[in-house]
From Swiss-Prot:
The keyword Membrane does not apply. This is Crossover junction endodeoxyribonuclease RuvC. The gene is ruvC. PROSITE patterns: RUVC. It catalyses: Endonucleolytic cleavage at a junction such as a reciprocal single-stranded crossover between two homologous DNA duplexes (Holliday junction).
């Protein structure tokens, strides 16, 4: 029976970050491929009328607190994709860069996932809608009552994606490096 239990070293803690200047989703999960457990979730907010530097500093402060409290093994950040609104893309990229910087200063590796990659990992469809992603996140985490906005469930989906796909991606990278 013990053969069915995961090796304690295989249990990982992943912090997902859905970057944004106005709303930055944070989601932390523990687990291994096929099983995820909710550790924490939040949305960091900055006022749209505040100076850019102040907004980035506020995101940094919030991300530092989450990284220090959660102590993740890896941080998964959503990769910026092309949008029609250049301002939104810039804000998302800047928030993602803050997450990268905060993690790098703590020696925590950062991985990037595209929205379609994340959607495929949690729903089986790369074009799933936000409602489908949120539904599956609640189901996969066995948290049907989780009341979290889309930014938060997107961050949890990022963390689940990395938790499940990260080990396979690392094995593929190692095999390709031989």
């Amino acid at each position: 029976m013990a053969a069915n239990l995961p090796n304690m070293r295989s249990i990982r803690r992943v912090m997902g970050v859905d970057p944004g200047l106005t709303r930055c989703g944070i989601g932390v999960v523990d687990g291994y491929p096929g099983l995820a457990r909710l550790v924490g979730v939040d949305v960091l907010h900055t006022p749209a009328d505040a100076e850019l530097g102040d907004r980035l500093a506020a995101l940094e402060d919030g991300l530092v607190q989450w990284l220090d409290r959660a102590a993740p093994d890896v941080v998964a950040v959503e990769r910026v994709f092309s949008q029609h609104n250049v301002r939104t893309v810039m804000g998302t990229a800047q928030a993602g860069a803050v997450a990268l910087l905060v993690a790098a200063r703590r020696g925590v590796p950062v991985v990037w996932h595209t929205p379609s990659e994340v959607k495929a990992a949690v729903t089986g469809q790369g074009r799933a809608g936000k409602d489908q992603v949120a539904f599956m996140v609640r189901r996969l985490l066995r948290a049907p009552g989780l009341a979290a906005p889309a930014d938060a469930t997107d961050a949890l989906a990022l963390a689940i994606c990395q938790l499940w796909r990260g080990a396979a991606m690392a094995r593929l990278a190692a095999g390709g490096a031989r």
